Amino acid sequence: MESTIGIVLVFTAAVVTAVLAFFGSAIGMYLAGKAASGVLTERPELFSKMLILQALPGSQGIYGLVGAFLILNFSGILAGGDLSGITTNTGWLYLLAGLPIGLAGLFSGIYQGSVAASGVLMVAKDEANLGKAIVVAAMIETWAIFGVLISFILLVSIAG
């Protein structure tokens, strides 16, 4: 019973890590895409530039996916080995270790999408502003990367 609860918690950790980051990416891409759609009705030649700005918040979803794989890998579930060592306490540790990726992905994805939407308006006024719009939106990416780093350090300490 103890091992079963721990394994369920590890799977929950993987799901929560991924889904939170997926939500952040989806909402962020929605915000940027909504702004881009308005611009593209008037200036369809800006499609490739708008696509770049809309895609930026998608990276948080990738981080969430990687985080889920890391949790399943570090716990030994992907390898299919002996899982009897995954206690309830260990399961909780994996769940906590995934939260930095999930929460950083959720919030940074949403805020990056909001900034990217503003960047869409910058580019609509002057195409030369694309680089500036990308840099400003990419600054928010830093926090998602820090979330990945913290989760990785926690996972290494659990498995070690």
How should these model regions be labeled?
Residues 1-160:
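Hydrophobic, small-residue-rich transmembrane alpha-helices and their short perimembrane loops
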